[in-house]
């Protein structure tokens, strides 16, 4: 019945309104652990971070059967909107995990770096690195020639606390490294060219 379709659209509008109202106020993290299709896929795209599980989660507006009917093209759920597609091509997902348990662990780790709301500071963690720690790698890694490349992952690992780095969108724009780390126990954002 047509009125049920209208009610569904109204429900989506309410969800999107809540996404917008919460934006910049609380962290919004979408965990996609199974199929997500139709209007429901817009909400994860509006959240701050999205995680998908490999092989079990899919996000697309219209599934493979409709694509086949309309275009004649055979496409799998994975190729249409699987975790690897959204991690490497569309950029909609920020993290991928092999299992749901691994996905939840990544979300917990992410939450350890960011404030719970816009009125709080990011969590401060006791730093176990010595305050006067020196890493000779930093004296050697950057080559004398400005045209010779070097690995920014090594630089990042050498300067952050305990080498702990949570990379965001690691499969998207491979020339760019973004993520979270800590320096002296304080959360920092990292942006680097690779």
Model-derived features with residue positions:
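Gly-rich Lys/Arg/Thr-decorated short loops/hinges at beta-loop-alpha junctions or inter-strand turns
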Residues: 1, 23-25, 68, 86-88, ...
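Conserved catalytic cores of soluble enzyme domains
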Residues: 1-119
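Terminal amphipathic helices with adjacent charged low-complexity linkers/tails
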Residues: 95-156
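Acidic-enriched, low-complexity/disordered segments with a strong bias for Aspartate over Glutamate
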Residues: 48, 74, 79, 129-136, ...
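Short amphipathic alpha-helical patches
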Residues: 4, 67, 90, 110-111, ...
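A sequence-level detector of short, solvent-exposed, charge-rich linear segments
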Residues: 34, 69, 106, 122-130, ...
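Non-catalytic terminal/interface segments that mediate subunit docking, oligomerization
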Residues: 147-194
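Detector for Asparagine
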Residues: 7, 19, 117-118, 126, ...
């Amino acid at each position: 019945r047509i009125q049920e379709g209208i009610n569904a659209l109204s429900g989506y509008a309410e969800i999107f309104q809540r996404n917008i109202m919460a934006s910049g106020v609380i962290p919004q993290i979408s965990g996609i652990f199974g199929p997500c299709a139709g209007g429901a896929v817009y909400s994860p795209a509006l959240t701050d971070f999205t995680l998908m599980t490999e092989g079990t989660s899919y996000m697309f507006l219209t599934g493979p059967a409709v694509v086949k009917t309309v275009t004649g093209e055979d496409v799998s759920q994975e190729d249409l909107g699987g975790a690897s597609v959204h991690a490497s091509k569309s950029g909609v997902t920020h993290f991928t995990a092999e299992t749901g348990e691994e996905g939840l662990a990544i979300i917990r780790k992410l939450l350890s770096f960011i404030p719970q709301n816009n009125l709080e500071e990011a969590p401060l963690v006791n730093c176990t690195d010595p305050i006067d720690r020196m890493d000779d790698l930093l004296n050697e890694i950057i080559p004398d020639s400005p045209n010779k490349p070097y690995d920014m992952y090594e630089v990042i690992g050498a300067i952050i606390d305990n080498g702990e780095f949570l990379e965001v969108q690691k499969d998207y724009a491979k020339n760019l490294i973004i993520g979270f780390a800590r320096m002296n126990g304080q959360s920092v954002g990292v942006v680097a060219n690779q």
